Each structure stands twice: as C-alpha cells, then as structure tokens.
Amino acid sequence: MRRHLSLFLGSLVIGLALLIAPAASWAYPFWAQQNYDSPREATGKIVCANCHLAKKLTQAEVPQSVLPDSVFTASVRVPYENGLQEIGADGSDVGLQVGAVVMLPDGFTLAPQDRWTDEIKEETEGVYFTQYSDEQPNILLVGPIPGDEHQEIVFPVLSPDPATDSNIHFGKYQIHVGGNRGRGQVYPTGDKSNNTIYTAPASGTIASIEPGDNGASVVSIKAADGSSVSETIPVGPEVLVSVGDSIEAGTALTNDPNVGGFGQVDAEIVLQNPVRIYGLLAFFAAVALAQIMLVLKKRQIEKVQAAEGV
C-alpha cells in the first residue's frame, strides 16, 4: 500500500512538473522507480540507460573497507562542462540537471541524519535522498538537482553489523552506481522526447514541411510508389532537410540536440571484521617486539665478545 501511494505521489509530482515548468530539463531516476522492480537488469545494465541513450562518464569513490555500524560516504561524480545547456521541453535552452542511483549491498542503508558529521551535512546541502522502495532501502536515489552545483553527489551510508543481523556477513561486496546528466531521448512510454535526433521513416522525396502544434514541424515524405508518410518533429531539434530533397529511410531529418548522457560503474567495498584488525595489529606488534629483542640480543652478544677480547 505504501509503495502504491509513493508511486501515485511520484506520478503526480512528475505530471505537475511537466505542466507547470515545461522548460526544465530532467534527469529523473524515479522514472525507473515507477517502471521497474529493480533498477538493474539481469544483464547488469542499469535501466536509466533505456531512456538516456548517450553514454557519458560516471565515477564513483567509496572506502576500500569499513567497520560494522559505521557511517561513511559514497561519492558519485557526474562530470560535464560547466554552463552547458540543452533543449528544454518547450524548446528553450536550459541548464542541465543531474541524478544518480546507488545500489548498495543488502544491509547497507542511508545513514540517519543524527549520525551525519558536519562535513557530511555541508557536502549534502540541497540534496534530497530517497530509497528505491520500502523493500529496498539499500538502493538510494538522488535527482533531479541542478548539475552546475552538484556534479559530485555524496551519499551518507550506514554499514550493517553482523553481530545484530545474522543475514549479514563480513567480506567483499559490490556497489553498482549510475549517474546521469540532462534529459532523456525516450520516455518510459517509448515515445521520443524533443532531445533526440529524428530520422526519415521511409525513402522518398521531401514533399512539404509544415508548422504543427506547439512549435512542431510536420515533414511529409512522398515515396516512389506515390504514398505519403509524415514525421512530426517537436520544437527543439533543428530541421536539416528542405522541400525537394531525396532521402533514404533512416536519413537524419534533424540535428542531434542532446548534450547529456548516462554512465554506470561498479565499485567494491569490504565489510571488515574488527577482530581481524585487532589480530593484525597484535601480529605487527609481536613482529616489532621480536625485532627489538633481536637487536638487543645482538648488542648484548657484541658486548660480551668485546669484554672477552674476541
């Protein structure tokens, strides 16, 4: 019930955002939240790539190892050139927004705010975290947020404690990370956005280019057999063809306005058993003590030999 309610509220927010602020660019990880039980397919692909078709660099940084019941940060970098703009839903130039998804191992969750350090509070200012679902608190989402201010997104994470949860074990785990900047090229419905290239659906000759609704252009193509087919190009992409041009199916009718893209990366983290650390420290201490004893013994022998005139 709570999941259905959260999905309904998410749909309502999306609808209002598109109606009230159509010029805003989007990088909504919760598109995936509403359409997929898990953001990662069996192939390993994060589903955001189904709508954000361009591949871009995403970087992740996590500690090599952490202790049980400790707070650490996972940083996701979504780099792009500052000040870069893209085509908004209404065809105007808008700044890029970013979003990220972090799939933590089972048991790892968003750290409670009362355990955030002052540094974490400063690094996460203006960032709102949500979990993928009530059943998956280990999958965290952020976005959309202004990209120029948040090209690095810091996730405060709480590690689990095997002493209090028998399902958790010490060892090495994988973290799956996805990061996006800018709008997608395809909506979850399968429809194209105005942030993508449009191509000819058939071979033939450009018969006409007429204005359509809301600033769109309707390109009519007359095929060799006399039939006609049209392609509606929304406001935003630049039409590259002219009336009378001969084209083949798949020929680009517009430029590609997209400047954003999605990337994913995996990272590894070790949930370290503190007993092993204590044992390792004890071993190092024993080795150091043995070295000291050997040095002292050697000096003692040298003194005895010197006294005996050897």
Curated annotation (Swiss-Prot):
This is Cytochrome f. The chain crosses the membrane at residues 277-297. Component of the cytochrome b6-f complex, which mediates electron transfer between photosystem II (PSII) and photosystem I (PSI), cyclic electron flow around PSI, and state transitions. One of its GO terms (molecular function) is heme binding. The gene is petA. One of its GO terms (cellular component) is plasma membrane-derived thylakoid membrane. Belongs to the cytochrome f family. It is found in: Cellular thylakoid membrane. InterPro entries: Cyt-f_TM (IPR024058), Cyt_f (IPR002325), Cyt_f_lg_dom (IPR024094), Cyt_f_lg_dom_sf (IPR036826), Rudment_hybrid_motif (IPR011054). Gene3D superfamilies: 2.40.50.100, Cytochrome f large domain, Single helix bin. The lineage of its organism: Bacteria, Bacillati, Cyanobacteriota, Cyanophyceae, Synechococcales. It is a single-pass membrane protein. Its cofactor is heme. SUPFAM superfamilies: Cytochrome f subunit of the cytochrome b6f complex, transmembrane anchor, Cytochrome f, large domain, Rudiment single hybrid motif. Binds 1 heme group covalently. Heme binds at Y28, C48, C51, H52. PANTHER family: CYTOCHROME F, PTHR33288. Keywords: Electron transport, Heme, Iron, Membrane, Metal-binding, Photosynthesis, Signal, Thylakoid, Transmembrane, Transmembrane helix, Transport. The 4 large subunits of the cytochrome b6-f complex are cytochrome b6, subunit IV (17 kDa polypeptide, PetD), cytochrome f and the Rieske protein, while the 4 small subunits are PetG, PetL, PetM and PetN. The complex functions as a dimer. NCBIfam families: PRK02693.1 (NF002736). The keyword Iron applies. Residues 1-27 form the signal peptide. GO terms for biological process: photosynthesis. It comes from the Bacteria.
